[in-house]
């Protein structure tokens, strides 16, 4: 199981994501690498999603659909969200990549969003409310001048792609379910440079964008609550 959930294809994306590459190529790399290791790309055909990975560039918050006509260019930031089924279990993780030299503003957004996830991990403790974690994540984002998407959050994961609990990253301390040993869920705040307002593309019904057109960033990990804290299953 542990081997399977780490089959996320991210190292290949790190090596090959550069100006001139299409998001369709990234999809193909991840698909081929996942299958080569005996896994199944979880997003493919999930509720009608047409590709094996989500590629979200700049103002796209999440669920971007890979496209051969979408070519990465210098200064872009992209989130590659890779989910895998292996031996009947699901994993879910994503990373941000800076394409070539990006602006200091985008670079800071990517950095702070990763810090939000690291803070979230540090707050995963058995028998404490899950809202403590979400509150700490939100506080760090706001202190750096950013907003956090409210409508989309983390989720349980394991034998199903999306399970309980729902994980908000705009929450209050001492609220929500207790984190108990054996619980597994994602920490995946979507942090916007501007407003937290978002909308879903009416044509493809998947792509979520910021309402103001400013960039968004997201890192995602799957964590397992243990008796003493947590284990990061995949990043």
What is each residue range found by the language model?
Residues 11, 36, 88-96:
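Active-site microenvironments in enzyme catalytic cores
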Residues 48-52, 154:
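Short Gly/Ser/Thr- and Asp/Glu-enriched loop/turn motifs at secondary-structure junctions
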Residues 6, 17-20, 72, 124-125, ...:
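Hydrophobic beta-strand core residues of beta-sandwich domains
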Residues 57-89, 164-219, 226:
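Acidic/histidine-enriched ion/cofactor-binding microenvironments in catalytic or ligand-binding pockets
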Residues 85-91, 98, 102-178, 184-196:
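Conserved, well-structured core segments that form or line functional sites
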């Amino acid at each position: 199981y542990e081997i399977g959930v780490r089959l996320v294809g991210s190292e290949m994306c790190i090596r090959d994501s550069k100006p001139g590459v299409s998001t369709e190529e990234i999809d193909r790399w991840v698909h081929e690498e996942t299958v080569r290791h005996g896994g199944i790309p979880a997003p493919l055909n999930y509720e009608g999603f047409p590709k094996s990975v989500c590629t979200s560039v700049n103002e796209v918050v999440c669920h971007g659909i890979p496209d051969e006509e979408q070519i990465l260019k210098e200064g872009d930031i992209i989130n590659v969200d890779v989910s895998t089924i292996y031996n009947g279990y699901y994993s879910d993780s994503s990373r941000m990549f800076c394409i070539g030299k990006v602006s200091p503003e985008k670079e800071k957004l990517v950095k702070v969003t990763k810090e939000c996830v690291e803070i979230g991990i540090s707050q995963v403790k058995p028998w404490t409310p899950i809202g403590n974690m979400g509150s700490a994540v939100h506080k760090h984002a706001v202190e750096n001048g950013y907003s956090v998407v409210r409508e989309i959050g983390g989720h349980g994961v394991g034998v199903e792609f999306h399970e309980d609990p729902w994980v908000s990253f705009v929450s209050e301390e001492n609220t929500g379910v207790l984190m108990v040993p054996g619980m597994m869920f994602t920490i995946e705040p979507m942090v916007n440079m501007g407003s937290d307002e978002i909308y879903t593309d009416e044509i493809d019904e998947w792509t979520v964008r910021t309402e103001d057109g400013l960039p968004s960033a997201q890192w995602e990990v799957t964590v397992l609550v243990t008796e003493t804290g947590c284990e990061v299953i995949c990043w």
